[in-house]
Amino acid sequence: MSNIPTELKYASSHEWIRKEEDGSYTVGITEHAQELLGDMVFVELPEVGDTVTAGEDCAVAESVKAASDIYAPISGEVIAVNEALEDSPELVNSSAYGEGWFFRVMPSDESEVDALLDAEGYQAVIDEE
């Protein structure tokens, strides 16, 4: 069973967000998603300054099994990307909720966070797959 931290919020498309002290949100993919994808070989991230829209694809995770679009859980401006993933995409596998984060976004509509799932809701999504 996948680890689903209770302090995070989740999208049904298997992304997570964590609120940071500056009001931004860190975005990554869940442990469940990286388990399904397998060993990461390449991650394509948005650019700092890009505007992302909730529910739209904004990054790509490529593994030995497949390439998968990564969707923005909330809308806003990308303020940072995890450049470590360029040389070490395997961080997504080894630390999905830590060093394997994808990007940070400053939300344009924080109410979108309320539409995301809590850990229990995300577990229900996994159980239905």
Curated annotation (Swiss-Prot):
Disulfide bond entries: none
Pfam families: GCV_H (PF01597)
A Gene Ontology BP annotation from the UniProt entry: glycine decarboxylation via glycine cleavage system
Keywords: Lipoyl
Record text on subunit structure and interactions: The glycine cleavage system is composed of four proteins: P, T, L and H.
Primary role: The glycine cleavage system catalyzes the degradation of glycine. The H protein shuttles the methylamine group of glycine from the P protein to the T protein.
Domain Lipoyl-binding residue range list: 24-106
Cofactor: (R)-lipoate
The protein's name: Glycine cleavage system H protein
Modified residues (N6-lipoyllysine): 65
Gene3D superfamilies on file: 2.40.50.100
InterPro entries: 2-oxoA_DH_lipoyl-BS, Biotin_lipoyl, GCV_H, GCV_H/Fam206, GCV_H_sub, Single_hybrid_motif
Gene encoding the protein: gcvH
GO cellular component terms listed in the entry, alphabetical order: cytosol; glycine cleavage complex
Family label: Belongs to the GcvH family.
Lineage, top ranks: Bacteria, Pseudomonadati, Pseudomonadota, Gammaproteobacteria, Alteromonadales
Domain of life: Bacteria
